[in-house]
């Protein structure tokens, strides 16, 4: 481990010890807000303190075993203990580095998934449908709930646009690296001469706004329109203008909701999406600026960035953000087996974060 990371660990352990002292202070105990804040921070630092203490004990065991190795009668046993201790130290070192990476506070959030057809006409809409189905299948494997907010079907299948809310533990942490342009190379069903066409679709993963991280929106900045829903709900939706369209005038962001029977419920849903969009837009601008400075590839979340190619004739999928990340398992991945990709992306992101921490003063 680099000395800079070791110093950060030691500082965090000192803070852990300080928090333990503070939480035994009667003045802190009687102050509910401070007690809660310090308790939360202590809980976050506890895994680092525990793992570092385990590392200290293992180093002591290693030193004792190395001393025993000088005794001919104990040498064989000592070498076994040395091998075990060294392997354990390697594991602990990796775990400590992982624990140093700041946790994204949005990781446990629900999210909005937006898939839109890009270049490629009907084939792009069909591909957008393939992507949405892929994410839906993955959500089913994770036992997450998928709620379609709005959709515009393509003329020959798929979707020109589909927006859904995904609800489940750790949903954003698993899918946050999916934002960007996805490209497909295959022979369309309508292609009579067997030529391979290239089409594209864009994916946006937007964390649902946490009430704690809520933002204030001036009602004067909103233009609210009502219209008749074309979605589910039977005859009722055709009789009343229950659907809502909200335009945020300063930014031009437009959101709609038409899946609920009442105008009030659709308005609430649309406002949730609007808040999420505005928060994510601000975060994305900050992340893009950081990415330009740090040359960060995985975590920027830029929707215009071409991130992945799905080559159907070769059964190949390539993620362009990670060197040599090509998998020849497209049939399973497109059916929702995304973990091999997601795990590699998360590992790459962790490596980038560790590099940043190592170079920080």
From Swiss-Prot:
Gene encoding the protein: prfA
Location of the region described as Disordered in the Swiss-Prot/TrEMBL record: 284-306
Any one Gene Ontology cellular component term annotated for this protein: cytoplasm
Modification N5-methylglutamine occurs at: 235
One Pfam family of this chain: RF-1
Lineage of producing organism: Bacteria, Pseudomonadati, Pseudomonadota, Gammaproteobacteria, Lysobacterales
Top-rank taxon: Bacteria
Sequence similarity: Belongs to the prokaryotic/mitochondrial release factor family.
UniProt keyword terms in alphabetical order: Cytoplasm, Methylation, Protein biosynthesis
Organism listed in the record: Xylella fastidiosa (strain 9a5c)
Protein name (Swiss-Prot/TrEMBL): Peptide chain release factor 1
Keyword Cytoplasm listed: yes
Function noted in UniProt: Peptide chain release factor 1 directs the termination of translation in response to the peptide chain termination codons UAG and UAA.
């Amino acid at each position: 481990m680099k000395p800079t990371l070791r110093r950060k660990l030691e500082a965090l352990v000192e803070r852990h010890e300080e928090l333990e002292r503070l939480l035994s202070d009667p003045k802190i105990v009687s102050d509910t807000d401070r007690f809660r804040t310090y308790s939360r921070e202590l809980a976050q630092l506890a895994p680092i303190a525990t793992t570092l203490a385990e590392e200290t004990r293992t180093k002591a065991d290693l030193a004792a075993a190395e001393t025993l190795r000088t005794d001919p009668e104990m040498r064989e046993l000592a070498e076994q203990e040395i091998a075990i201790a060294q392997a354990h130290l390697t594991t602990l070192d990796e775990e400590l580095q992982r624990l140093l990476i700041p946790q994204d506070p949005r990781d446990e959030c629900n999210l909005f998934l937006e898939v839109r057809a890009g270049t490629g006409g009907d084939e792009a809409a069909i591909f957008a449908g393939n992507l949405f189905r892929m994410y839906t299948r993955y959500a089913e494997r994770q036992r997450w709930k998928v709620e379609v907010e709005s959709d515009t079907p393509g003329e020959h299948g798929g979707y020109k646009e589909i927006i859904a809310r995904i609800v489940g533990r750790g949903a954003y942490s698993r899918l946050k690296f999916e934002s960007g342009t996805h490209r497909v190379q295959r022979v369309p069903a309508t292609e009579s001469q067997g030529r391979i066409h290239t089409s594209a679709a864009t994916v946006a993963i937007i964390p649902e706004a946490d009430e704690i991280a809520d933002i204030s929106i001036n009602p004067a900045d909103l233009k609210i329109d009502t219209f008749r829903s074309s979605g589910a709900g039977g005859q009722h939706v055709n009789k009343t203008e229950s659907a809502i369209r909200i335009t945020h005038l300063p930014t031009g962001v437009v959101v709609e909701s038409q899946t609920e029977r009442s105008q009030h419920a659709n308005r609430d849903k649309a406002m949730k999406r609007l808040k999420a969009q505005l928060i994510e837009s601000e975060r994305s601008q900050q992340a893009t600026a950081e990415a330009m400075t740090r040359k960060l590839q995985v975590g920027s979340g830029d929707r215009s960035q071409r991130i992945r190619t799905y080559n159907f004739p070769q059964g190949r999928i390539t993620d362009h953000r990670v060197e040599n990340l090509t998998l020849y398992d497209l049939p399973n991945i497109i059916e929702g087996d995304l973990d091999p990709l997601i795990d590699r992306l998360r590992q790459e992101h962790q490596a980038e974060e560790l590099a940043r921490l190592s170079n920080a003063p």
